[in-house]
Amino acid sequence: MSEKIVLVGAGGHAKSLIDVIELENKFEIFGLVDNAKNGEVLGYKVLGTDEILKEIKSECANAIVAVGQIKSAKIRISLFNKLKELGFNLPVIISPLAYVSKHASIGAGTAVMHCACINAGAKVGENCIINTKALIEHDAVVGDNCHISTASVINGDVRVGDGVFFGSNATAKNGVIIEQNSVIAMANIYK
């Protein structure tokens, strides 16, 4: 029987994560927690607010932040730190439809979504979203708490600081440095 995992957040990104987790088939979804929603998400129960995480820990040792990131990583960082403090395991979730080189490294709590590609020598930090069809090229470094959005391209040797939101279809030219907490608009070319 597979290990259980709880998703912290119950919005759109949670739906995408559910799809990846079901396809990956490494974890059984225990449920979701969310401060603003109740009911169900794609057939999985919203168990309550994040105040119940301490209780859940005895039944479910794994968790992932399922809140997306637009403009600021503050909420994702706060939830990630809370999960670490409570002693949850924060596994890397990788879609079987993604490609991750055996020569790349990925930090705890990061989600690599469908059709994303992380090439040799790339390093991705903790608590990141590498979204659908995103490309992280050779030797690029993505800091902690970043959201690399759908169909975006981080070319070789790029350095992405912590907390960056990199918009859909944006491209970073080889070797550039993107300062921490930057917001790169969709379809931009960052040079």
Regions found by a protein language model. Name each.
Residues 30, 61-62, 162:
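Conserved acidic residues
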Residues 1-44, 54-55:
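Hydrophobic, well-ordered beta-alpha structural blocks that scaffold small-molecule cofactor pockets
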